[in-house]
């Protein structure tokens, strides 16, 4: 995204930053002679490496660094595993799709705004992990340019984040022709991507795809993933576990259980996706091959009042908090009806006035979003059209998540002890939500809050250079406020303000640590 091409109104931004880019034209940025790849960081064989351009470009220097894989190796081995090869995927399946963005925040974690050309973190488009994870891997010390030594292969597709052009905006024939739900074209695009990988590289066939990683940020995660990917590792936001699943989105064009046939695909597309769970921490038939539910991206300003960025820990004077879509204008199956039921109970019972039980949209619950989260004891985690990032919101604010989604793993539930810092309520027990929460002893509440303070940093992304610098600035500012307020308060509120390095053991590091544990199982 460091390269922005301006037309009459909006920028066309790339999903990644360029390290050796010579010019930008109406056809897009071009790499310097001798360089290639998605980020122009790869040098053609036999040519000497050139000095990085990053130090000469302040707008780059503040946001990223040269990929270690693009630098002359040191005399002693210092590299850390896992080593990950990032495919320079055919542009049709990734970067070409981004030209169809009609709004700057779509499908990116960062954009450059005109006329000041400032970098703005973007989490309003909730699928931003697609480009974020891609960029993190490109500049990571875990990246390798040598596929022969790779532990894993990352496939940076854009099927999940920007399905509109895949379904009907892009060049004809739209992956087996137009028609049917958008999921059909997305499925066909990923099957074509595997065909392209097989025609271009030998690595998929070498281990049957077990060491290949695919990210699914779509509302219903990998529920619709084509069966050809079953042996691969899936990173997803939606940890639905039930094997006999059906689409529950209220967004009709994304229903993955509605088949469609045409002359280009007379068998329909359901035959290519049936039979696998949406997510499985232990995949049947593929021993050791696992999936992982990972966090959605949240910009630092989203949680600016949280003790996680060293803001003062304050009294938790809000018993329960949720602000967002409560299904007032949705189909009944939205959120499995959970948000609607809790909202109705609270409104009819006058819980806001009686118990400081706050739930509703912006008209019902007003005030600073981060401030309210940082003052709440319990926070609702319920689905939307599929996954919802409310678990991340709760955890990074030190609020105890109240999870009401049956048979669904939340973020990192397969690798962290979520029970130690969260509360689970069965969907059948929604009517008892107030009774259940009121019955939790104060000692248990403080224990869960303390445990949140041990893991909350793993639910935010902080290691990208620009993110790290912004987080440190925010922490410095909040620490000064904390020093001023400390003299006026002797109470100890949990979790205590975070004092560590925001780049250490963040969400990306947690994913890499988990991948390291999976290396033996891909062989």
Labelled PLM ranges:
Residues 180-314:
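Catalytic core of nucleotide-activated saccharide and alditol-phosphate transferases
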Residues 126-144, 195-199, 287-311, 362-365, ...:
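A Trp-anchored, charged/polar loop motif used as the substrate-binding/catalytic surface
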Residues 91-93, 158-162, 219-222, 241-242, ...:
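Short, solvent-exposed loop/turn segments at secondary-structure junctions
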Residues 308-313, 333, 337-392, 396-400:
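Donor nucleotide-activated moiety binding/catalytic core segment of transferases
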Residues 2-8, 43-213, 217-218, 463-471, ...:
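N-terminal pre-catalytic "stem/leader" segment of glycosyltransferase-like enzymes
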Residues 314-328:
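Conserved donor-binding/catalytic core segment of Leloir-type glycosyltransferases
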Residues 368-460, 473-477, 485-489, 498:
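Catalytic binding pocket for nucleotide-activated donors in carbohydrate/polymer assembly enzymes
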């Amino acid at each position: 995204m460091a390269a922005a091409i301006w037309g009459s109104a909006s920028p066309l931004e790339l999903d990644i930053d360029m390290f050796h880019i010579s010019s930008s034209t109406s056809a897009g940025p071009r790499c310097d002679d001798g360089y290639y790849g998605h980020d122009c960081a790869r040098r053609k064989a036999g040519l000497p490496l050139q000095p990085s351009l990053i130090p000469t470009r302040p707008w780059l220097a503040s946001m990223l660094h040269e990929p270690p894989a693009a630098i002359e190796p040191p005399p002693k081995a210092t590299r850390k595993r896992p080593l990950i090869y990032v495919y320079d995927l055919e542009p049709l399946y990734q970067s070409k799709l981004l030209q169809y963005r009609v709004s700057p925040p779509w499908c990116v974690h960062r954009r450059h705004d005109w006329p000041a050309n400032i970098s703005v973190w973007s989490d309003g488009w909730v699928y931003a992990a697609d480009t974020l994870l891609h960029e993190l891997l490109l500049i990571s010390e875990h990246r390798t340019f040598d596929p022969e030594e790779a532990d894993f292969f990352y496939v940076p597709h854009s099927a999940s984040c920007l399905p509109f052009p895949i379904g009907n905006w892009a060049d004809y024939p739209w992956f087996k022709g137009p028609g049917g739900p958008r999921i059909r074209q997305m499925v066909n695009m990923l099957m074509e991507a595997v065909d392209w990988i097989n025609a271009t590289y030998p690595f998929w066939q070498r281990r049957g795809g077990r060491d290949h990683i695919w990210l699914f940020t779509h509302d219903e995660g990998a529920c619709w993933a084509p069966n050809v990917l079953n042996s691969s590792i899936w990173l997803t936001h939606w940890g639905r576990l039930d094997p006999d699943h059906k689409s529950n989105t209220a967004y009709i064009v994304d229903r993955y259980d509605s088949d469609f046939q045409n002359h280009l695909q007379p068998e329909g597309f359901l035959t290519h996706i049936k039979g696998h769970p949406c997510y499985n921490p232990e995949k049947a038939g593929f021993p050791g091959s696992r999936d992982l539910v990972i966090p959605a991206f949240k910009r630092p300003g989203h949680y600016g009042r949280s003790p996680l960025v060293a803001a003062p820990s304050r009294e938790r004077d809000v018993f329960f908090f949720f602000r967002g879509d409560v299904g007032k204008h949705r189909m009944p199956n939205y959120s499995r009806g959970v948000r609607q039921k809790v909202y109705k109970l609270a409104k009819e019972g006058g819980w806001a006035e009686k118990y400081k039980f706050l739930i509703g949209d912006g008209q019902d619950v007003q005030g600073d979003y981060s401030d309210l989260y940082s003052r709440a004891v319990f926070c609702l985690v319920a689905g939307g059209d599929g996954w919802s990032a409310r678990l991340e919101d709760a955890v990074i604010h030190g609020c105890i998540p109240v999870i009401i989604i049956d048979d669904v793993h939340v973020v990192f539930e397969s690798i962290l002890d979520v029970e130690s810092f969260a509360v689970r309520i069965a969907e059948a027990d929604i009517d008892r939500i107030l009774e259940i929460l009121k019955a939790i002893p104060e000692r248990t509440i403080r224990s869960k809050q303390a445990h949140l303070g041990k893991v909350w940093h793993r639910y935010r992304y902080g290691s990208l250079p620009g993110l790290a610098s912004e987080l440190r600035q925010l922490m410095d500012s909040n620490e000064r406020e904390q020093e001023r307020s400390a003299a006026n308060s002797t109470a100890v509120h949990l979790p205590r303000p975070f004092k560590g390095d925001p780049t250490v053991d963040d969400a990306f590091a947690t994913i890499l640590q988990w991948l390291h544990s999976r290396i033996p199982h891909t062989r």
